[in-house]
A protein has these predicted regions:
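A short hydrophobic/aromatic micro-motif that marks alpha-helical segments and, especially, helix-coil
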Residues: 17-18, 116, 156-157
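Compact, aliphatic and Gly/Pro-tolerant "microcore" segments centered on a short helix or tight beta-hairpin
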Residues: 147-150, 164, 168
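Short glycine/proline- and aromatic-enriched beta-strand/turn motifs that initiate or cap beta-hairpins
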Residues: 19-82, 165, 169-171
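Extracytoplasmic loops and strand-loop junctions of Gram-negative outer membrane beta-barrel proteins
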Residues: 37-41, 117-119, 149-151
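A generic structural micro-feature
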Residues: 28, 48-50, 85-87, 124-126, ...
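Cleavable N-terminal export/targeting peptides
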Residues: 1-30
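Short, exposed beta-strand-loop hairpins at the edges of beta-sheets
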Residues: 144, 151-158
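Gram-negative (and chloroplast) outer-membrane scaffold detector with strong preference
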Residues: 54-146, 170-172
Length: 172
């Protein structure tokens, strides 16, 4: 639980610093963007629970003032980080809140399918779960942005774990 609170404090500190550092209002927030990202499901086991991958976000299917609803999907792999490699697929709805012309907070709530492929075995181990990962998104240019935030996940059998997600985004 201490990792969750430290992540939330870092997110808020980054928000206050970046709001003043990027005050140009000429950038409009994209409705669609793709990202390259690294995420970890557990702060205590970053290498073992981490994955690098790509995501597609459609963050503005519906809009009410500064609130948007949308969806997203992501695919990541943990190949080369540990002996037993795995992959994960996340998909689900998201809520976005605009903080200004360059910043928004995105809150995806995703179903998670995690598959591992043990070395030397033909068996595949699959688990389903749920992830919630609020991210602060900052757009440097109209087509390029960065994001980071905490990530909470559970596979419905064990306690929830807390990790992080970070990456770069490209609007299209």
């Amino acid at each position: 639980m201490k990792h969750f609170f430290s992540s939330a404090l870092l997110l808020l500190a980054g928000l206050s610093i970046s709001q003043t550092a990027l005050a140009d209002d000429s950038v409009t927030l994209p409705e669609r963007h793709a990202s390259a990202q690294f995420s970890s499901y557990d702060f205590d086991h970053v290498k073992e629970s981490g994955s690098y991958g790509a995501a597609l976000y459609i963050t503005s299917i519906g809009q009410w003032d500064k609130f948007h609803v949308g969806g997203n999907c992501s695919f990541g792999v943990n190949a080369g980080l540990v002996d037993d490699w795995g992959c994960q697929f996340e998909f689900g709805p998201s809520v976005r809140y605009d903080l200004g012309s360059r910043f928004f907070v995105n809150l995806p709530v995703n179903a998670l399918c995690f598959a591992t492929f043990p070395e030397g075995s033909t068996n595949t181990h699959t688990e389903w779960g749920l992830t919630v990962s609020p991210t602060l998104n900052a757009w440097i240019t109209p087509k390029f942005g960065v994001f980071a935030g905490p990530k909470m996940s559970t596979n419905f059998k064990n306690d929830a774990t807390f990790g992080f997600v970070a990456g770069v985004s490209f609007a299209f």
